[in-house]
């Protein structure tokens, strides 16, 4: 029996299920940086101006994890790294001065800010923060699967004597890149099949359990990072959520994993009429 849970770069998956094209892979990279001097270290998610993907700041016990995720076929390291630094500097600047903008003027346009960019007091604050961070950050990078809808129909990740789990199987949310839940759930489903002596049932079990959700997310991905009423869909989505409590609640549940993609249209329609 062969079970592979060795990530998106799994050589076992390439051999047994076939290699995925770059268009079905995402790149995530970032920095582990010190906690802000103030006690305020919020979680922040920011959609990238002019790019597919998003940036994040996730505080941990002893550091803040900053990162960017985008599709591998659109990946350009230099401008994305500059955009991430712009986001990081804005994050720390806001901890020291709540009036400071998250993005520099260039970063807000999705362009390289060339470090701290701009001029005046904001320029000086970002420059001093950058000097401190350059000496203390630790870099990391990873690949994340983001399968196309049709790939879910054709790609097998299990057989009579083998199985792929988690990222090795391509089990990650194509919209957000989240994969921890699917890694744990696929392991649980496989364990049930193995203990029952029915390993070949694993393929059917994962498809019935969460396969439709992942495929639905994959179909929604292009729309999610597209445009709506003359602006990026993500910007319109935030505007609607700010104004409407029902939409705000639904999006919060979607991000938290409490609302599935399959039923999200119906939920939004109901809550648009009855917000509570």
Task: Name the predicted role of every residue range.
Residues 74-193, 199-201:
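FAD/FMN-dependent oxidoreductases across multiple families
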Residues 26, 81, 162, 217-220, ...:
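A general structural signal for well-ordered alpha-helical segments in protein cores
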Residues 14-15, 175, 181, 216:
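Short, function-defining helix-loop hinge/capping sites that tune catalysis or transport
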Residues 19, 180, 186, 234-235:
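Residues in and immediately flanking transmembrane alpha helices
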Residues 192-276:
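C-terminal helical "tail/cap" subdomain of flavin- and related membrane-associated enzymes
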Residues 1-105, 113-115, 121-132:
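Predominantly flavin-linked oxidoreductase catalytic cores and closely associated redox partners
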Residues 5-7, 48-50, 60, 69, ...:
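Fold-independent oxyanion-binding glycine-rich loops
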């Amino acid at each position: 029996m062969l079970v592979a849970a060795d990530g998106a770069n799994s050589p076992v998956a390439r051999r047994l299920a076939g290699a995925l094209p770059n268009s079905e892979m995402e790149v995530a990279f970032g920095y582990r940086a010190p906690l802000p001097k103030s006690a305020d270290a919020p979680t922040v998610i920011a959609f990238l101006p002019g790019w597919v993907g998003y940036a994040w700041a996730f505080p941990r016990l002893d550091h803040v994890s900053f990162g960017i995720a985008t599709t591998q076929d659109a990946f350009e390291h230099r401008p994305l790294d500059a955009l991430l630094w712009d986001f990081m500097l804005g994050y720390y600047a806001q901890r020291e001065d709540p009036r400071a903008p998250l993005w520099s003027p260039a970063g807000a346009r999705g362009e390289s800010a060339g470090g701290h960019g701009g001029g005046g007091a904001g320029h000086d604050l970002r420059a001093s923060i950058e000097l401190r961070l350059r000496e203390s950050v630790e870099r990391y990078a990873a690949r994340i699967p983001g399968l196309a809808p049709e790939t879910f129909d054709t790609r097998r990740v299990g057989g009579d004597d083998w199985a792929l789990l988690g990222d090795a199987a391509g089990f990650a949310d194509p919209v957000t890149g989240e994969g921890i839940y699917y890694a744990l759930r696929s392991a649980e489903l496989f364990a049930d099949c193995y203990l029952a002596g029915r390993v070949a049932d694993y393929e059917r079990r994962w498809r019935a359990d969460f396969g439709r959700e992942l495929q639905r997310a994959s179909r929604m991905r292009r729309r999610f990072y597209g445009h709506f009423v003359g602006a990026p869909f993500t910007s319109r989505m935030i505007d609607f959520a700010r104004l409407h409590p029902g939409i705000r609640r639904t999006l919060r549940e979607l991000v938290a994993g409490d609302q599935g993609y399959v039923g999200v249209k119906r939920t939004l329609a109901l809550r648009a009429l009855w917000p509570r």
